[in-house]
Amino acid sequence: MSLSPHVENASIPKGSTPIPKNRNVSSIGKGEFLGSSSSNNSSFRMNHYSNSGQPSVLDSIRRPNLTPTFSYSNGVYMPESHRTSSFNDSYLPYDKNPYAKTTGSMSNKSNMKIKTKKNAINTNTRKSSGLIYTTKVDKELSSIDKVNDPNINGLVCAGKTHLGLYKFSPSDRSIKCVHDFITPNSNTSTRGTTSLLPKLSKRTRQNKFSTIADVKTGFNNYKNCIAVCNNSTAISIYDLNKSSSIDNPLITSLCEHTRSINSFDFNMVESNLIISGGQDSCVKIWDLRSNKSKSSNRSDISINTASDSIRDVKWMPGYNFASKNDQGSSTYGNLKSGYKFASIHDSGYLLKFDLRQPAQYEKKLNAHTGPGLCLNWHPNQEYIATGGRDGKCCLWFVGDNANAAENTVLNYGNSPSLHAPNTSLNNSGSLAFPKLTINTGYPVTKLKFKPAYSSNIYNSLLGISSMGDEAEVRIYSLARKYIPKHVLLSETPSLGLVWWDENLIFNIDKGTRINGWDINKEPTVLENLSKNTTTWRDLDGNGLLSVDQEIGSYEVVEPELQPTSSTTCKKHPGTIKNPKNGNPENQGIIGGIKKGFSHTGLTSFTPERPPTLKAGPTFSSKSLTLASGASSFNSSSASLTSLTPQTENREEIAIEPPCIITLDIPQIFNNIRLTKIAHSRKKNVISESSSMKNSPVEKFKYLARQLKFSYIREHNVSDSADTAYKNDIENIDVVKNATETHGDNTTTTNNNDDGDDDDDDDDDDDKIIESHLLKKYNFPENNTWATLMNEKVNNKKSKRNSSSSREFDEKDVRSSISSISASRQSHDRSRKIDKNVEAELQEKIQTLVDLISIATHNASVYLSIDDLTNFKIWILIRDSLLWDLKWMTSSQISSDNASNMDANESSDFEAGENLKTGKEFPEEDGAGTSGAESLVEERPQAFRANSDEPSDAEKKPVSKLKEQLKNTEIIPYAQPNEDSDEVLTKLKELQNQRLESRTKMGETVSDDVIIEEDEHEHQEEEQPHDSPTKSAQFHASPIAKSIPILQKREHRKSFIDTFMLHSPNGYNGDTDIGNEDDNISPRFTYNSVSPRSKVSSLQSYATTTSQLETFKKLSSHTAPIIGSPRHAPSRPDSIGREQLSSSLTKKLAKCKKIIADPPWDTKKLIKQLYNQATETGNVVLTVNILFLFQTIYQITEIDIAKDAIAHFLLLLHRYELFGIAADVLKYCPFEDIMGSEGDQSSIRLFCERCGELITNESSKEKLRAEAQQTGNKKIMDKFGYWYCDSCKKKNTSCVLCERPLKKLTMVILPCGHEGHFQCIQEWFLDENEQECPGGCPGVAFI
């Protein structure tokens, strides 16, 4: 038989080692491959060639060399000199070798000697000798399969316009095209002859196969059948024996799929069955015995997988592996090979089915993150290898859990854990992990297991063909997944592969070349790798890498088998012969299943797995259609042969990979440098912060990411007040740890208060930054929260003795706000606050706690970038909020404690004074400024005596503020005179009236605080609940309202005192007579009084002259009047300035008139900081203040706040901080933050008749002029957009009343008719109609 002119045969002498490397061969590049070639189970479509008979221009395009100089495929470095495992310049085909002799005939080319070039490679490198067959075809190839006839050394290759039968000869190592089923005249070389087929001429349109071509051959009785995609939705079956041009080789066509077919496969056991899957997500099973016609449009079994497109579908193989034992030869097979099949889908899911129960899949595994492209069953075990577009090849166990122990081995190196599968038989949605994952780096389009028996799954070989530019076929041993065992290089990228037997493997490439290798003659990759190599670990040169001299192997050591006498081996189901008589449709698996379908039977087809009732894939056949999970099977008519179980369990020992020793020299040097230079890390952090400071853009981005702009998020996250306090305490510890290391006089703290020590690097950096900046700028430590915490610890260490009989009993303040409320109610059950007021108070306290935590966090952020100005601003805001929080919690305790005073030892004057001065605010001086934690953890000092208390003369003033306020003269007003007698008389009367009214009304201490949404709406409601006790707290001494640091050493000048004394509304030394009157009130105390004293400042002078006694009386009578309900403010920072009645004296009026808000008033302070931020252009601080405090203190107008936040959002978008901008919008307290830019949209109306834009400007001007002339403004009501000035026609009228649609319009969606809202409402709702008023068919409204 002559050779086909379409095949270029390269005969190779026996014993030679030819390795083709034709770089000038005509081929197509990567781009043409994606557009013209096809690949089995691939995910892309390719265009057909043109219908003309001329050769494609793509065949003449030269493909560039795809072999790189250096290859890093799969993490293995291979220089080109070592990439000769399959390709070598010394072995080129004769027709392409420039050194070959040009004389001689074609018949003796195979016997000619080839002059080879000297190959300058390492002599230790083993050359390839495994390439046995190679030939080039001038037709495009896309799929390959072997002929399952042992008497024929045949291959079947398919392409768009080619379906050829090829035979290879082991004797002369040649491949020849025997027959082309598409162009049967290709075997004749006579020019001008035509096909012998009837009605076929030269101009007959050439047949083409599907764009997604796949080819498969049958088994056993159907080994002469070839299945191929004839078009996108049909499978054509050809007969190999009908190779003559007279016979028509087409047997039948299977065309039930509605979309393209991607894969099909013959059953190895029941060879008459063929399965197919396609884009329609359906699996079709065909019985070739029942499809004897030329075309069949209905399959025997149809399964809708209820998933997406099927990329590949395969039957479980049924190989017969013969072995010898004591009883003789035996055959190993698989019992379930005739019934199981699997499919892989676009979604990456792997589904396993049992033909006996097709209504429900057995397993569903999420195999790949992207589309799955191919799968292949293990020859004798229930494992499936899958390949996907994600570049991974995964091994999955799909058997029963009972057999899982057979396949476990010991782990080694970085191999995945070989755990037992966690899927059950009926668990369709179980989550499982692959037994093994091979990262190829390219989409895996084809993979095939070596058809050899393997008792250990990890001794199996797997051939992989990728879609990338790597022109090679890799063969992996599952025992060593990181380094392939063989790399078979081809000229162009591989398109498919097939194992002929255990040693011979064929592939086709993009260059239309068929290659065959003998892997026993191929060197392994480890043999060609250099043994003495030291190189950098990565491209950046970070570390060295060397390879151990022990190479290792690719196999797992297996112990010898221990055969048992009880092992009996039965014949494989593939050897079953159909009886000669009887209907073939009722024989075999299909017949057994169809016989087993019964409407009344309740038993399962097999007792091992009952039918499931889950909703799953739909199943249909010619005889019966089953609903999901609603059918049952009958096992009365199916006789199935069984196989012996597989080999018994054996213990396996995994091989150890080569030892890789790394030496990270830069890291070693870096560690040495860090040990020698202890402060280098601190310098690096400080240099980074300074570099950020020099870049305003980077600083803005950093602040936008790190700062907290809203307390709403923090409030929502907190489940209770305890969570908020816990977060606040953690923030306190960060600042505390940062300041512990600087200053010689800093008090040592106890780090075990919270029980948490954070050793992270980030916390260490914060400590370094904060310590450095505090020391650099000499920031006074008595203004930091850490010092307040130090004081709290020291106070806990000091001894506390019980007080006198007039003092209160010791009580612990619990660690939450709710416990404070419960303790207060237990003290005096008769005085209960309304539940609504209590809830409102708790909410406001929680808000304050959140704001304090945010202020602390923002201060630490500014400190980390060396921005001391903004750092002090946030510290100032935090301390001001602490004062408000302290007053709210302390007022509750003090009001209850005041009721426990002994009436016999305390007069009305003393009770008021003790509550206002000595009993509450000295406690606040001691611990009130130590943050939220001190409010709920520390015991109030006002309720205890201190034996170690120093004398009054030894105590020093806390701040300069108290010294300046002490300079006022009070003696003239303390001396008794006529005016003072009159004042005392009036004050005494008012006090008695106040006390009587208070007793009658049962007043309690008001819980109102400074945080109010609407101050004026709630002021009248809160006034009846005010008491002199609260007013006294408002006018306590300035020392009580400041934030002093109590330590037994001389304090430096406080930053808060310095800043506040220069406030425009603050105090100075120039006071007049009126201010002196003001100083008489309990607002001030003497500097010689200890803040920890249990006795008020006035009581400490009880034994002095009568002048002081008179002053005490004056103070006691003045306080109730100032704190009367009539003048009680609803906020502690806003005191009424209304004029007193004419009955009071002039000096009493002055005493009330000049009372001003304290300089640390929170609202005043935040407004000043806001104005300063706007004047200096501090955008971040401005927006931060508006976010946190606008809704609480009304910093500015609401429109200005919205505009500022909207511009801040635009700034975030400009610097691509979209996530932060989204959070700003999410937690913004204003809904319409974007204003006209975010809520309004321009809608253009076009005329439905002429298509012009409806503006109606001309009619608008006419109506406006007419309205001006007549003075009738109702004329403008005629204007609208319900008509068009261009075409002078009206738009659609109402479907019911047929009047113009001028106002609100409703549209009926099913038909599109429009109508007035009133008309549609009357038609559908009032009249209960369901059809359209226009008479459109169907229900329009339900």
UniProtKB/Swiss-Prot annotation:
It is found in: Vacuole. WD repeats lie at residues 207-248, 256-296, 305-342, 367-406, 439-486, 489-527, 844-884, 1130-1170, 1217-1256. Disulfide bonds: none annotated. One of its GO terms (cellular component) is cytosol. Residues 1-39, 559-593, 600-619, 630-651, 736-766, 788-831, 942-963, 1014-1047 are annotated as: Disordered. PANTHER family: GATOR COMPLEX PROTEIN WDR24 (PTHR46200:SF1). This is Restriction of telomere capping protein 1. It comes from Saccharomyces cerevisiae (strain JAY291). The lineage of its organism: Eukaryota, Fungi, Dikarya, Ascomycota, Saccharomycotina. The gene is RTC1.
